[in-house]
Amino acid sequence: MKGGSIELGEVSKNASTNKGVKRGLSIMDFILRIIAGVATLASAVAMGTTDERLPFATSFVQFRAEYDDLPSFVFFVLANSIVCGYLALSLILSILHIVRSTAVKSRILLIVLDMVMMGLLAAAASAAASIVYIAHYGNTQANWFPICQQYNSFCERISGSLIGSYIAVALFIIIILLSQSAISRN
C-alpha cells in the first residue's frame, strides 16, 4: 500500500474537518440572514411609520412631514420590505445548506440573488441618505433649507432607519463572502 492511501473503514481527517467547517459557515450564514432580516424589517417599519406635525399649526394650515411625501423614502420602504421577504424565504435554502453541506448549485443561486438584493438595498439606502442629508443640512444654492430643526423626531427616525439598512448591506457582504468560501471548499 502507498503511504497516502486510506484503508477501508478509515476516514480522512481533511474530509471531516472540511465538512465541519462548511457546516459552521452554513450556521453562520443562517444567523447572519436572520440578523439582516431583522435589520431590514426594523428599517422598513421605522421609516414607514414616520410622521410628525408641528405644534404651532392652525386649523387651516398644518405643517407635517411624512415618509410618503418623498419618493426616495417610499422606494426605501419598498426595497427594505422586498429584501426582508427575500431573506425570510432564503432561510429555507440556508437550512438546506446546514443539513447538506455539499449543495453547490443552490449556494451559487443564493450568491447571485444575494448580490441582487444587496444592490437593491444599497441603492435604496443611498437614495434615502441623500434626502436625509438635505433634511439635516439643506442646500443653500438651491434655497433648500434644513428641516431637522423643526422636525426633530422625524429626522431622528429616518436617520435611525438608514443605520439599520446599512447594517444589512454590510451583513450581505459578509454573507456573500461566507457563501463563496463554502463553495471554494468543495
UniProtKB/Swiss-Prot annotation:
Q: How does it assemble?
A: Homodimer and heterodimers.
The scientific name of the source species is Medicago truncatula (Barrel medic)
- Provide the family line: Belongs to the Casparian strip membrane proteins (CASP) family.
Transmembrane regions:
27-47, 73-93, 108-128, 158-178
Provide a GO CC annotation, any one: plasma membrane
Pfam families, sorted: CASP_dom
What GO biological process, any one, is recorded here? Answer: cell-cell junction assembly
Q: What is this protein called?
A: Casparian strip membrane protein 1
Where's it found, cell-wise?
Cell membrane
Entry keyword Hydrolase: no
Query: Which residue ranges are assigned to the Cytoplasmic compartment in the record's topology?
Result: 1-26, 94-107, 179-186
Q: State the function annotated in the UniProt record.
A: Regulates membrane-cell wall junctions and localized cell wall deposition. Required for establishment of the Casparian strip membrane domain (CSD) and the subsequent formation of Casparian strips, a cell wall modification of the root endodermis that determines an apoplastic barrier between the intraorganismal apoplasm and the extraorganismal apoplasm and prevents lateral diffusion.
Q: Keywords of this protein's UniProt record, alphabetized?
A: Cell membrane, Cell wall biogenesis/degradation, Membrane, Transmembrane, Transmembrane helix
Primary location recorded for the protein, binned into one broad class: membrane
User: How does this protein lie in the membrane?
Assistant: Multi-pass membrane protein
* Stretches assigned to the Extracellular side: 48-72, 129-157
